[in-house]
Regions:
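Active-site neighborhood of phospho(di)ester-bond hydrolases with catalytic His/Asp-centered motifs
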Residues: 6-11, 45-56, 71-73
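Phosphate/diphosphate-binding loops
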Residues: 65, 70-72, 76-79, 85
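Short acidic, glycine-rich surface-loop motifs adjacent to enzyme active sites
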Residues: 1-23
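Surface-exposed loop and adjacent secondary-structure segments within mature catalytic domains
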Residues: 1, 75, 99-102
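Loop/turn elements at helix/coil->beta-strand transitions in domains of secreted/extracellular proteins
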Residues: 2-6, 43-46, 66-68, 162-164
Length: 205
């Protein structure tokens, strides 16, 4: 009886696809089944802000059974969610929800954060080392199909092991490799896990 508006922050469902242009690719958009089920099973929630799936909701979903408003931004800070609620007698009588595009290259850096980033860049510089090579074009990831970066990783595995076939999971590719000089930092951004490469012999049948 002391709450005027109940807002729930959720983090469930399938993780967002590891693909740089995922928000522009309907093929990899994650379903909201778990969020919808939760909002239908728990009455009294005015606003549910979802996460984890990175499924941007441009217009709020109104749950048909409970009236809960459901929204979510895309991932990686590409949008800023803005919610305006008009409340009368503890009821949301109007709402306006927007996903605002964030153009990070147009924003000045925060001085304190920039200083800390610069400090840690100096700390890890010896581990990064000099450039290892160059990319003549950006090597991108795709989540549901073959990609240039995925092909490169698989080719490295084959070269290292002498295997006939190599397989890597798309979810383990966490960043594209940019055009230009590539150092160990770029490699760790793209493939940050301490995975073991394992060779097995399989029957052809």
């Amino acid at each position: 009886n002391t709450v005027d508006v109940l807002i729930v922050l959720g983090h469930q469902g399938l993780p967002g696809a590891m693909q740089t242009d995922a928000e522009n690719d309907p093929e990899v958009q994650r379903p909201l089944d778990e969020d919808l089920h939760f909002c239908g099973a728990v009455p009294g929630i005015n606003l549910y802000i979802a996460a984890h799936s990175h499924h941007g909701i441009e217009q709020a979903i109104v749950h048909p059974d409970t009236g809960t408003l459901i929204t979510q931004t895309y991932g990686y800070g590409t949008r800023l969610g803005r919610v305006r609620l008009k409340v009368n007698d503890r009821r949301v009588v109007a709402h306006d929800i927007e996903l605002l595009k964030v153009w990070s290259d147009e924003l000045p850096p925060h001085a304190a954060v920039a200083a800390r980033v610069a400090h840690y860049r100096q700390v890890i510089a010896p581990q990064i080392g000099p450039p290892l090579g160059r990319c003549t074009a950006r090597l991108i990831r795709k989540y549901n199909r073959e990609s240039p970066l995925g092909g490169l990783i698989a080719d490295v595995m084959r070269a290292r092991t002498g295997a006939d076939v190599a397989v890597t999971n798309a979810g383990g590719l966490r960043a594209d490799l940019p055009e230009g000089a590539i150092d160990r930092g770029h490699i760790l951004d793209a493939f940050p896990f301490l995975n073991d490469t394992t060779t097995v012999e399989l029957a052809g049948a």
